[in-house]
């Protein structure tokens, strides 16, 4: 087979954007590792950009408007972003989670890819997310008789509207293989959607341990203007309820009952920002907003503990990033949180008073002064190379 001609067409709406360089970075990291492995592929980043009315509406709802981007760079190559044109009503419909608007978006993805790519050149289509990307992949597969696979990342399974249950089950069943980033997510698909997992496989996210690695904690804190004499609890993610951001004030209050030397470093943006600023107790927190992805290794090195109070998750890459930098991780039972934490923290925390339980676990880890920078522990953390080696096996199996 010619190495110059791509065999696999990979596409997704998730990729780094100007105001959110961490968004979809797990897709780009996969592509980098795939390129290093030598398997020929093409990438189609797809998106719909915000008009002026949509930018205003997003700001009113506490969301950051998107900024148009022309291409996504992977290694030394630039892949043009394919724009899905939607009317104002449907753009508002996406924000309001209206099923008809999301179906138009999914159909628009298929049309944009078909218009800009010679589909018949490929031997396999890989959609990252079961919906809406997976629906576009299924349509293209049926039209061109090319197999497709999907990767379920989380939200399209655990937070899926009931209106899409039948459709998403169909997308999963018709795929040559359905990849899930955690065992918990595949179990959720089985229980929630009636998926039979006959074509399912679990391949977790990885982390670049050459980038996320231990560095001097004091230096990291100085550069980020964080206190040197405190135990720092980090939160990284969108400031929304599904990520458990609303639980942070109660966690902080409970933790202050146990110790006075704590400080919260909150990285992320979202509709709960104003509320969190008002409710976090005292002067014990710093809201960093969205950090450039290049600063994330420093951020992870600045903290003692990462707290993951999520209500739903797939397989949080932030947990692996924190572990690779030597931080302890405390999290709920949501999705693949416990799988991602492994033995480098405490996962699976449940209970009616979840905030108190999380604060007690945080305090316990701080009391022990745990730091996980040893090479033995870091060697157990999955890398992107590990992830892609498994995905490549799936590719070849589907193209035989």
List the predicted regions and their residue ranges.
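Conserved donor-binding/catalytic core segment of Leloir-type glycosyltransferases
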Residues: 9, 227-243, 249-252
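Short alpha-helical donor nucleotide-sugar binding micro-motif in glycosyltransferases
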Residues: 290, 298-303
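Nucleotide-activated donor-binding/catalytic signature segment of Leloir-type glycosyltransferases, i.e.
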Residues: 274-291
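A charged, aromatic-enriched C-terminal amphipathic alpha-helix characteristic of glycosyltransferases
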Residues: 370-399
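Conserved acidic donor-binding segment of nucleotide-sugar-dependent glycosyltransferases
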Residues: 343-355, 364-369
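Carbohydrate-associated surface elements
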Residues: 184, 206
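Aromatic "clamp/platform" in nucleotide-sugar-dependent glycosyltransferases that forms part
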Residues: 311
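Short hydrophobic beta-strand element within catalytic cores of glycosyltransferases
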Residues: 328-331
């Amino acid at each position: 087979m010619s190495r110059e001609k791509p065999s696999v067409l990979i596409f997704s709406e998730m990729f780094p954007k100007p105001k959110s360089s961490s968004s979809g970075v797990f897709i780009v990291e996969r592509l980098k590792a795939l390129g290093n492995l030598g398997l020929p592929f093409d990438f189609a980043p797809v998106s719909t950009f915000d008009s002026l009315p949509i930018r205003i509406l997003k700001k009113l709802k506490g969301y950051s408007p998107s900024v148009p981007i022309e291409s996504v760079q992977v290694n030394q190559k630039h892949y043009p972003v394919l724009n899905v044109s939607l009317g104002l009503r449907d753009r508002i419909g996406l924000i309001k989670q209206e099923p008809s608007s999301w179906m138009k978006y999914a159909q628009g993805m298929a049309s944009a890819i078909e218009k800009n790519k010679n589909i018949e050149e490929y031997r396999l289509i890989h959609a990252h997310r079961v919906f809406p990307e997976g629906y576009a992949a299924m349509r293209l597969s049926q039209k061109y008789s090319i197999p497709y696979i999907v990767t379920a990342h989380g939200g399209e399974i655990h937070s899926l509207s009931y209106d899409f249950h039948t459709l998403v089950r169909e997308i999963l069943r018709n795929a040559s293989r359905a990849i899930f980033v955690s065992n918990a997510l595949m179990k959720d698909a089985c229980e929630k959607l009636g998926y039979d997992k006959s074509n399912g496989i679990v391949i977790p996210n990885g982390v670049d341990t050459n980038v996320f690695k231990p560095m001097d904690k004091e230096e990291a804190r100085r550069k980020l203007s964080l206190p040197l004499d405190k135990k720092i609890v980090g939160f990284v993610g969108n400031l929304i309820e599904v990520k458990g951001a609303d639980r942070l004030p109660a966690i902080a209050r409970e933790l202050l009952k146990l110790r006075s030397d704590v400080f919260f470093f909150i990285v992320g943006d979202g509709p709960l920002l104003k509320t969190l600023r008002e409710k976090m107790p005292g002067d014990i927190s710093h809201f960093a907003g969205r950090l450039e992805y290049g600063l994330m290794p420093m951020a992870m090195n600045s903290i003692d503990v990462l707290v993951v109070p999520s209500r739903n998750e797939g397989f949080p890459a932030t947990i692996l990033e924190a572990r690779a930098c030597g931080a302890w991780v405390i999290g709920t039972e949501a999705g693949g949180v416990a799988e991602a934490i492994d033995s480098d923290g405490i996962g699976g925390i449940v209970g009616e008073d979840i905030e108190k339980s999380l604060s007690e676990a945080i305090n316990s880890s701080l009391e022990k002064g745990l730091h996980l920078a040893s090479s033995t522990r870091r060697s157990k953390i999955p890398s992107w190379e590990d992830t892609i080696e498994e995905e490549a096996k799936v590719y070849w199996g589907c193209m035989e």
